[in-house]
Structures are given as structure tokens and as C-alpha cells.
Curated annotation (Swiss-Prot):
<protein>
    <recommendedName>
        <fullName>Serpin A11</fullName>
    </recommendedName>
</protein>
<feature type="glycosylation site" description="N-linked (GlcNAc...) asparagine">
    <location>
        <position position="350"/>
    </location>
</feature>
<dbReference type="InterPro" id="IPR000215">
    <property type="entry name" value="Serpin_fam"/>
</dbReference>
<keyword id="KW-0325">Glycoprotein</keyword>
<dbReference type="InterPro" id="IPR036186">
    <property type="entry name" value="Serpin_sf"/>
</dbReference>
<dbReference type="InterPro" id="IPR042178">
    <property type="entry name" value="Serpin_sf_1"/>
</dbReference>
<keyword id="KW-0732">Signal</keyword>
<comment type="similarity">
    <text>Belongs to the serpin family.</text>
</comment>
<dbReference type="Pfam" id="PF00079">
    <property type="entry name" value="Serpin"/>
</dbReference>
<dbReference type="InterPro" id="IPR023796">
    <property type="entry name" value="Serpin_dom"/>
</dbReference>
<keyword id="KW-0722">Serine protease inhibitor</keyword>
<feature type="signal peptide">
    <location>
        <begin position="1"/>
        <end position="19"/>
    </location>
</feature>
<keyword id="KW-0646">Protease inhibitor</keyword>
<dbReference type="InterPro" id="IPR042185">
    <property type="entry name" value="Serpin_sf_2"/>
</dbReference>
<keyword id="KW-0964">Secreted</keyword>
<feature type="glycosylation site" description="N-linked (GlcNAc...) asparagine">
    <location>
        <position position="106"/>
    </location>
</feature>
<dbReference type="GO" id="GO:0004867">
    <property type="term" value="F:serine-type endopeptidase inhibitor activity"/>
</dbReference>
Length: 422
């Protein structure tokens, strides 16, 4: 009999809802993947040891996905990195180090124990209840009923990652796959459907992470200002008619002359914000190549509030990825071969990773909205020297980064090429 297979599964759903704003207690600002300053007497939360690395991992992964996929991109760096870190708990020393170093951690500067405590702190902070936004992150382990897991592993994943363990009958792969999909669908309130594809009867474990985010704009768009049909230019030869939201509101934004792109920060109620990056026509690859932590820090320092004439499409996109083909290209090579040692899970050797699947969705639409029709042209970069209000017209492909502000964690990262692709 061949080796048994292990699946890593990550899912994410982001939904933005428009509603009346509450009184603000001050503007939120993107600081980039750097923790905010603390008083000298106050120790920094443990998650500050890991969030910059997660951001760097996200940017590396994005570039590989962009090189492979010309269309929409959307994934959750927090979901994928959490799943891999959780897996490392069941790996022996060499394999565990390979996983964490592949994520980008320097184990000399940040020992493994500190990394896991960082994830524990991050997940705990993200799970804190908030009346202003809904954020749910969870981890689950589905282990073949014929195997007995090591109690130390079960205790560790529960204590550090809040992971629940379930017994599963992988000899009946169809039924078990349906049960796991149903579980993930319930945890994401019906938004993530059929995330787990078919798998082999030799599967012995599925490690799943899910993240659900739902928030309301600090400054809502009026549905009466939404144009039912406006042109969105996928490329030089292709245009689509899409619903285009419109508002004149105070937002932080800038025009980066070096990279030829507009950068816009839109705040949600609660501790979250969206960063939208709109390259000038023909400049997407230039901007993507420059995606580095220092670029995000620069933007965070230069964003200034201004009354902005904003046009933003309603969109709903998703991303489904088999990351076993992508992860080796960014340093996670050896965890996918027969030499990887995950005997810390059950005490048995010859258990290898077969699949690393990830699915994420984003919905920035207004339910049931009906509005008039209009069309637009390719926009030019906003100019601060004109008498009219600066404007940002998102009628061509743009980047989307969604941040949780307290932890400075990059929850979602993507590119909108076709707003109506689903």
C-alpha cells in the first residue's frame, strides 16, 4: 500500500455591508506590516512577532499566483499561514523547521515556541467580540478513525490554535468529504461551499482553517448614487458593463508617481480597513513587482485625508487554489515529499502531504440594489493641483488588501480583474 495522504485546507470569506455610519473615534491608518509603538513599560503582544512575516509571506505568494493566473486573485494569508503553522506542530524537528522557515521565519531570532505563541495571540485577538464587525477564525482536524492521534498533539493544537479534532471515516471518501464541506459551510454561514474536492481513500487527515469577515463601511455608499452599468476595462481590448458605486467622501489616499498608481484607504466600522491600489493603464506589472513590506510602509506614511470623488465597482470574486504546486516555488519544498516527517501527529511514519487547498471569496456588493445606467472612460491619476475634487475611478484592474488594524494582520489579498466573474 502506498503512502497515506494528508490534506491542508484553508477557506476564507469576506463580505462588506453598507449601512449608516457611527460616530468615529478617530481615523485609522495603515502602518504597513509594522506593529504600532508601545510604551517602554508595556510588553508588545505576542502577535507582533509574526504579523510582519505573514505579510511578507503573503506578498511572495501573491507574486507567484499572479505569474500563474492572469485573472482575479483572492486568498487569505492568515488562513494559509495558520494552517501551515498548525501542521508544523505535528512535524518532527527538521520538517517543522522547514515549514516555519518556508513561511519566512528566522528561527534564530524567533524560536518555534514564540511563533506558536504569536499565532495563539493573533487568533485570540481576532476572535474578540466586536459590535462593529464580525470576524471568525477557526481550525479543525479531521483524523481517520483507524488512527490514534498523539495526545500531546491534540493538546497543543487546542491550546495554541483552538483547533477541534474530529474522527472521520476516510474509507468512505464521498460521505466524509460531504461532511467536511458541510461543516465548513456552516462555520462560514453558508458562504464557502464545496471547498474540499474529491480525495483518495488513502487520506488519513484533513487539517482545515476557515476565516469569515463581515464589516460595514465607516462612510457608506448611497445606493441611489450607484450607476447600474458603467464600463470596466479588463484590458486594452476588453470592457464590461458593471454596477459602479459613487460617493464624495473624506478618505486617505495618495498618488505614487514613482510607481504610477493611486492608493486609497477605505475604513470600516471597527478595527479594519481596505487598501485599494489602482495602477495607471499598463502599469499593473510594475506595481506588482514593487509589492514589498517597505512599499506598504511608505504608502502608510504618505496617505493623507482629502475629499475624494470615488467610483468603485460592486464586485464579487473568489479564488480556489491547489497550493501544492505553488508553495515549493516560495521555499516550502520538502514538506511535500516522502522525506517529510509528520509522525508527531500519530506516531506513524510514511504519512505525506498530498494536497494544500485554499478557497477564498469576497463580496463588496449591495444586496438588491437598482440604479440608473451610465458609462465612463479610462481615468487618469488624480491631480492635487486642480480646482476640482481629486478623484479615483476604479474602472480597470486593481489590488485589494484587507487589514485588521489592532494586530496589523493582512487578512486578505487579491486582484480584481473582472468584477463580475464570481
Amino acid at each position: 500500500m502506498g503512502p497515506a495522504w494528508l490534506w491542508l485546507l484553508g477557506t476564507g470569506i469576506l463580505a462588506s455591508v453598507h449601512c449608516q455610519p457611527l460616530l468615529a473615534h478617530g481615523d485609522k491608518s495603515l502602518q504597513g506590516p509594522q506593529p504600532p509603538r508601545h510604551q517602554l513599560s508595556e510588553p508588545a503582544p505576542a502577535y507582533h512577532r509574526i504579523t510582519p512575516t505573514i505579510t511578507n509571506f503573503a506578498l511572495r505568494l501573491y507574486k507567484e499566483l499572479a505569474a500563474d493566473a492572469p485573472g482575479n486573485i483572492f486568498f487569505s494569508p492568515v488562513s494559509i499561514s495558520t494552517t501551515l503553522a498548525l501542521l508544523s506542530l505535528g512535524a518532527q524537528a527538521n520538517t517543522s523547521a522547514l515549514i516555519l522557515e518556508g513561511l519566512g521565519f528566522n528561527l534564530t531570532e524567533t524560536p518555534e515556541a514564540d511563533i506558536h505563541q504569536g499565532f495563539r495571540s493573533l487568533l485570540h485577538t481576532l476572535a474578540l467580540p466586536s459590535p462593529k464587525l464580525e470576524l471568525k477564525v477557526g481550525n479543525s482536524l479531521f483524523l481517520d478513525k483507524r488512527l490514534k492521534p498523539r495526545q500531546h498533539y491534540l493538546d497543543s493544537i487546542k491550546e495554541l490554535y483552538g483547533a477541534f479534532a474530529f474522527s472521520a471515516n476516510f474509507t468512505d471518501s464521498v460521505t466524509t468529504g460531504r461532511q467536511i464541506n458541510d461543516y465548513l459551510r456552516r462555520q462560514t454561514y453558508g458562504q464557502v461551499v464545496d471547498c474540499l474536492p474529491e480525495f483518495s481513500q488513502d487520506t488519513f487527515m484533513v487539517l482545515a482553517n476557515y476565516i469569515f469577515f463581515k464589516a460595514k463601511w465607516k462612510h457608506p455608499f448611497s445606493r441611489y448614487q450607484t450607476q447600474k452599468q458603467e464600463s470596466f476595462f479588463v484590458d486594452e481590448r476588453t470592457s464590461l458593463q458593471v454596477p459602479m458605486m459613487h460617493q464624495k467622501e473624506m478618505h486617505r489616499f495618495l498618488y505614487d508617481q514613482d510607481l504610477a498608481c493611486t492608493v486609497l484607504q477605505i475604513e470600516y466600522r471597527g478595527n479594519a480597513l481596505a487598501l485599494l491600489v489602482l495602477p495607471d493603464p499598463g502599469k499593473m506589472k510594475q506595481v506588482e513587482a514593487a509589492l514589498q513590506p517597505q512599499t506598504l510602509r511608505k504608502w502608510g506614511q504618505l496617505l493623507l485625508p482629502s475629499l475624494l470623488d470615488l467610483h468603485l465597482p460592486r464586485f464579487s470574486i473568489s479564488g480556489t487554489y491547489n497550493l501544492e504546486d505553488i508553495l515549493p516555488q516560495i521555499g516550502l519544498t520538502n514538506i511535500l515529499n516522502l522525506e517529510a516527517d509528520f509522525s508527531g501527529v500519530t506516531g506513524q511514519l510514511n504519512k505525506t502531504i498530498s494536497k494544500v487547498s485554499h478557497k477564498a471569496m469576497v463580496d463588496m456588493s449591495e444586496k438588491g440594489t437598482e440604479a440608473g445606467a451610465a458609462s465612463g472612460l479610462l481615468s487618469q491619476p488624480p491631480s492635487l493641483n486642480t480646482m476640482s475634487d481629486p478623484h479615483a475611478h476604479f474602472n480597470r484592474p486593481f489590488l485589494l488588501l484587507l487589514w485588521e488594524v489592532t494586530t496589523q494582520s493582512l487578512l486578505f489579498l487579491g486582484k480584481v480583474v473582472n468584477p463580475v466573474a464570481g
